[in-house]
Regions:
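TRNA-recognition modules of translation machinery and tRNA-sensing kinases, especially anticodon-binding
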Residues: 17-18, 24, 31-34
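Mixed-charge, glycine-accented linear interaction segment located at domain edges/termini
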Residues: 219-223
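Structural motif
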Residues: 124-126, 205, 209
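Glycine-rich and polybasic anion-binding loops at the starts of cofactor/ligand-binding domains
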Residues: 8-12, 94, 101-179
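Intrinsically disordered, compositionally biased tail regions
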Residues: 257-265
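Single-stranded nucleic-acid nicking/binding segments centered on His-rich, glycine/basic loops
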Residues: 147-205, 212-214, 227-258
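Hydrophobic-cavity lipid-handling domains and compact docking modules
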Residues: 34-120
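Short, small-residue-biased leader/transition segments that mark boundaries at the very start
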Residues: 1-6
Length: 265
C-alpha cells in the first residue's frame, strides 16, 4: 500500500528530526519510569515469573516494557506482519532508539498450532484463536527487542521498584492481601492447598516477599507465558520451558522465504 508506506516513512522522518531537536534527559526519563513503578495497580502487572532449572526467575512483563519505551522517550517499538499463509504467520518485531540509531529486530515464523498434552500439535482454525496466538507471540518478541535497547540497569531498577511497591502494598492488612491472592489463583484452577505446597507452609504464614513472588507466578500463568504445572502439582499441565527456550531461533526473512520455496518445490 503506497500511501501507508509513504505515511510511515514521513512519520519516522518526523520522529527522527524531533529526537535530534529534543534529546532525552536521562535523569528525567529514569524518574518518570520510577514514578510509574510506584503505582500499585501498575506494579501488580509489571513483572512475571518463569522457571529456569530449579529456580524461579522474575522479569519485566510486556506491560512494563511498553512503559519503559513510553517514558524513556525518542524510541519506536512495534510488531509488523509480513506474511500469513500456509498455516503460519511471519512477522517482524523491532525497537529503535532514534537518538543513537541503535535498533534491535527479530523476524519470526509462528505456526498456527498449539501443543497438546503428550507433545502433539493441534492446528488452529478459528481466526480469533489465530489472532490471539500471533498477537501474544508478537508482543513477547517486541518486549525482547525493547529490553535489548533500553539500558539493562534501567529495566532492572524498574523491576526492583515494582517489587518494592508490591511488597509495601496500599496499607491493606496482609491477611486481606493473602486472601485476595488465593482468590486470584482459584480463578486459574489453583487451590489454596497447591499454593501452600509450593510455599512450604500454611497460607496465613505468607510473607510480603512471598506475595510478590506469587504475583509474578499469577501474571505468567494468566498471560500464558507459563503453565500451572511449572509451579504447582498439575499432572495435566506439562511443564514448559523458560520463555527464552520456547522462542524459535530468529532467522532473517530471506532464509524463511527460501525455506518456504523449497517446501513448495
Amino acid at each position: 500500500f503506497p500511501y501507508t508506506t509513504l505515511f510511515r516513512s514521513q512519520r519516522v522522518q518526523g520522529a527522527i528530526i524531533s529526537a535530534k531537536k529534543f534529546p532525552r534527559d536521562s535523569n528525567q526519563a529514569f524518574a518518570r519510569i520510577m514514578e510509574a513503578c510506584k503505582r500499585p495497580s501498575f506494579a501488580a502487572v509489571a513483572t512475571f515469573s518463569y522457571p529456569r532449572g530449579n529456580e524461579t526467575v522474575s522479569g519485566p512483563s510486556i506491560r512494563l516494557a511498553e512503559v519503559l519505551v513510553q517514558n524513556f522517550g525518542n524510541m519506536i517499538a512495534g510488531v509488523q506482519e509480513l506474511e500469513s499463509q500456509d498455516g503460519a504467520t511471519i512477522f517482524r518485531s523491532y525497537c529503535w532508539d532514534l537518538e543513537t540509531n541503535f535498533t534491535d529486530e527479530k523476524i519470526f515464523r509462528v505456526p498456527h498450532t498449539i501443543r497438546l498434552k503428550g507433545g502433539s500439535m493441534k492446528p488452529l482454525t478459528d481466526p480469533r484463536d489465530i489472532y490471539e496466538l500471533v498477537a501474544n507471540m508478537g508482543a513477547r518478541r517486541k518486549r525482547g527487542c525493547i529490553l535489548a535497547v533500553v539500558p539493562k540497569d534501567v529495566s532492572d531498577a524498574a523491576v526492583a521498584k515494582c517489587r518494592e511497591t508490591l511488597k509495601r502494598g496500599t496499607g491493606e492488612p496482609i491477611g486481606d492481601r493473602i486472601r485476595n491472592m488465593v482468590t486470584l489463583f482459584n480463578e486459574l484452577g489453583v487451590n489454596q492447598e497447591m499454593v501452600e505446597t509450593r510455599l512450604g507452609h500454611k497460607i496465613d504464614l505468607t510473607t510480603a516477599d512471598e506475595l510478590v513472588d506469587l504475583h509474578g507466578i499469577y501474571n505468567a500463568i494468566r498471560a500464558k507465558e507459563a503453565k500451572r504445572g511449572d509451579f504447582f502439582a498439575f499432572p495435566e499441565d506439562e511443564p514448559s520451558a523458560a520463555p527464552e527456550a520456547q522462542s524459535p531461533k530468529a532467522k532473517n526473512l530471506t532464509d524463511l522465504l527460501k525455506q518456504k520455496s523449497a517446501v513448495k518445490a
